[in-house]
Amino acid sequence: MNDLITKHPMDGVRFTKPVRATDDIKFLTRDEQRVFLKTAKRSRNYNQYALILETGLRTGEMIGLTWDAIDFQNRTLTVNKTLEYRHKQHFWRAGPPKTQQSYRTIPLTDRAYEILKGIWDSRPEQKESPTLAKTLEYIDRRTGVSSRLVMRDLVFINWRTGEPAKN
């Protein structure tokens, strides 16, 4: 033998994502959720925690939530965008969800409806201002089309109080 490899040993091998075993998926039981929310009641972020537990939203989906995605009449919430922080570039980026399966319409439970309706009813009248007129622009990764997200449509949460930011 001359110790030469004539063919790459990985030729013909397909790389696939590892399949996650169902017992590897971590979730809170109903009792754990109840204890968590009882403890979180004192938190400024209680509404966010409760909404995530009620709807199954990911964090980026929740902070990218806009009022036009909420249908109070039909009691649904549509996930069609996310908001994520780009640490290296030091800015927030609004964009589409990461996968096609992430686009979805979620029926609101009575509790989720109460949370969102409470936030909607407690917000001050929107006033036009230069700040509210600013837009976030992003490029849709799938289509390459430049899109615009209007700031006044975003629901920003004041992390100190846990309530919607007042503009």
Which positions does each model-derived feature cover?
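Basic, Lys/Arg- and aromatic-enriched nucleic-acid-binding interface segment
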Residues: 5-65, 72-73, 84, 101-103, ...
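Proline-centered turn/helix-capping motifs that create local helix->coil transitions or kinks
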Residues: 1-11, 72-75, 81, 85-88, ...
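DNA/chromatin major-groove-contacting recognition/catalytic segments
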Residues: 35-36, 88-93
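Short secondary-structure boundary/capping segments
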Residues: 25, 69, 95-98, 145-146
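Extended hydrophobic-aromatic, low-complexity segments
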Residues: 46-49, 73, 79, 87-89, ...
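Small disulfide-bonded, cysteine-rich extracellular recognition modules and tandem repeats
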Residues: 16, 80-82, 159
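C-terminal catalytic core of Y-nucleophile DNA break-rejoin enzymes
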Residues: 76-78, 94-118, 136-141, 149-167
